[in-house]
Amino acid sequence: MEVSQFDNVSVVKKANLYFDGKCVSHTVLFPDGTRKTLGVIFPASLTFNTGAAEIMEINAGTCRVRLAGSEDWQAYGAGQQFSVPGNSSFDIEVQETLDYVCHFE
C-alpha cells in the first residue's frame, strides 16, 4: 500500500473534524468510486467507531491501538498498518502527531 501520492482524484475541500479538532482529515475520491481519508491525529486517547471496514496506514508518528473485544494494545509506527472490521470500534493512543491514510473497504 506504500504509495507516495494519489493521481487523478477529487478532494473534498471541507475538512472532517472529530473530537474537538484532535483528528482532522480530508476525503479523497477515486475514479473507481472508492474513497480514502488523509489526516492527522494530535496527541490524545480516542475511540473511533467504524461503519465500513478500514485499513489504517501510518505515514508518520506512532500510536497504540486496541480493537473492540480485545484487551491487548498493539504499537504501530510509520510504514505499518492495521485493519479494523466494519461496524466495530478501536481505541487509539497518540503521543505525537500521527499522519495517516484511512483506506475504506
Swiss-Prot record:
Catalysed reactions, as listed in the record: a purine D-ribonucleoside + phosphate = a purine nucleobase + alpha-D-ribose 1-phosphate; adenosine + phosphate = alpha-D-ribose 1-phosphate + adenine; cytidine + phosphate = cytosine + alpha-D-ribose 1-phosphate; guanosine + phosphate = alpha-D-ribose 1-phosphate + guanine
Domain of life of the native organism: Bacteria
GO CC annotation, single: cytosol
Keyword Transferase among record annotations: yes
GO molecular function: guanosine phosphorylase activity; purine-nucleoside phosphorylase activity; thymidine phosphorylase activity; uridine phosphorylase activity
Transmembrane region(s): none
SUPFAM superfamilies: RmlC-like cupins (SSF51182)
E.C. designation(s): 2.4.2.1, 2.4.2.2
Keywords from the UniProt entry: Glycosyltransferase, Transferase
Keyword set includes Transferase: yes
Family matches, as PANTHER family: PYRIMIDINE/PURINE NUCLEOSIDE PHOSPHORYLASE, PYRIMIDINE_PURINE NUCLEOSIDE PHOSPHORYLASE
Family from the record: Belongs to the nucleoside phosphorylase PpnP family.
HAMAP family in UniProt: Nucleos_phosphorylase_PpnP
Protein task: Catalyzes the phosphorolysis of diverse nucleosides, yielding D-ribose 1-phosphate and the respective free bases. Can use uridine, adenosine, guanosine, cytidine, thymidine, inosine and xanthosine as substrates. Also catalyzes the reverse reactions.
UniProt protein name: Pyrimidine/purine nucleoside phosphorylase
